């Protein structure tokens, strides 16, 4: 089992601390949420783990491998997959070519193995019928499936999902939740940050709540819902799953 650890992360902008001493862990085969009010520091924390935002203090570790100084692309090679909120599909490439764009840079696979892996991913995510479709022609739900399949083409240990429920219709939300559960069941560790707290908590085993740059709660969804501090600053008294 692999473990992704963010330890004592801190970040300041122009002298103002936006993240202070935040720690979290994600294990293989579990779904973890990183949530909080707008401006709480959760997105900055998430981006420090991904490698988009440099941390001022703290460490990012996969098992015993400290990757704190590595850029995003190097972290990807160590096992961190990242799916941004914005559409990241190559619009003028087919679904097949989108997958091969990642598989081609994997020097651990032969040409035949890359072809086999592309076919496996299309079958796994039920996008075989879209093989020759251009990225720009896909629906929101189809695009998300292709983007997740492409992220898995890099063979990550963990996948970090930025706002996976944003900009998709209710049917697609259900579909994405099933995909996230499938990723967990496949042995990946999944970290989600999303403004849709209801859908995120519904799919998580654990969650971390950040407010004003500090970690204020950590636990199961039930524990989070019962936390009085979380109710006061984030969820309110009447929130229910």
UniProtKB/Swiss-Prot annotation:
Protein name: Lipopolysaccharide export system ATP-binding protein LptB
SUPFAM superfamilies to which the protein is assigned, alphabetical: P-loop containing nucleoside triphosphate hydrolases (SSF52540)
Family (UniProt): Belongs to the ABC transporter superfamily. Outer membrane lipopolysaccharide export (TC 1.B.42) family.
Keywords from the UniProt entry: ATP-binding, Cell inner membrane, Cell membrane, Cytoplasm, Membrane, Nucleotide-binding, Translocase, Transport
GO biological process, one term: Gram-negative-bacterium-type cell outer membrane assembly
Record: residues binding ATP: 36-43
GO molecular function, one term: ATP binding
Subcellular location: Cytoplasm; Cell inner membrane
InterPro entries: AAA+_ATPase, ABC_AA/LPS_Transport, ABC_transporter-like_ATP-bd, ABC_transporter-like_CS, BCA_ABC_TP_C, LPS_export_LptB, P-loop_NTPase
Reported phenotype of the disruption mutant: Results in an earlier growth arrest and onset of cell lethality.
EC number annotated for this UniProt entry: 7.5.2.-
Record bears the keyword Cytoplasm: yes
UniProt induction comment: Transcriptionally regulated by sigma-E factor.
Domain ABC transporter: 4-237
PROSITE patterns: ABC_TRANSPORTER_1 (PS00211), ABC_TRANSPORTER_2 (PS50893)
Membrane topology term: Peripheral membrane protein
């Amino acid at each position: 089992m692999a473990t992704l650890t963010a330890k004592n992360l801190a970040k300041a902008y122009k002298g103002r601390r936006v993240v202070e001493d935040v720690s979290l862990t994600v294990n293989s085969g579990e779904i973890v949420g990183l949530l909080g009010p707008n401006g709480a520091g959760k997105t900055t924390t998430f981006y420090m783990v991904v490698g988009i935002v440099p941390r001022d203090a703290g460490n990012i570790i996969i098992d015993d491998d400290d990757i704190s100084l590595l850029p995003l692309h190097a972290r990807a090679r160590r096992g961190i997959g990242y799916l941004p909120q914005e559409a990241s599909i190559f619009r003028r490439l087919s679904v097949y070519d989108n997958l091969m764009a990642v598989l081609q840079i994997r020097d651990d696979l032969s040409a035949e193995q890359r072809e086999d892996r592309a076919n496996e991913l299309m079958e796994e995510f039920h996008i075989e019928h879209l093989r020759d479709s251009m990225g720009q022609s896909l629906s929101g739900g189809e695009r998300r499936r292709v983007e997740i399949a492409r992220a898995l083409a890099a063979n990550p240990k963990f996948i970090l999902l930025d706002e996976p429920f944003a900009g998709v219709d209710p049917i697609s939300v259900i579909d994405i939740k099933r995909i996230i559960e499938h990723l967990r069941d496949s042995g990946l560790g999944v970290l989600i940050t999303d403004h849709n707290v209801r859908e995120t908590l519904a799919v998580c085993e654990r969650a971390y709540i950040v407010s004003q740059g500090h970690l204020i709660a950590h636990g199961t969804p039930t524990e989070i819902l019962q936390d009085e501090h979380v109710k006061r600053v984030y969820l309110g008294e009447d929130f229910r799953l």
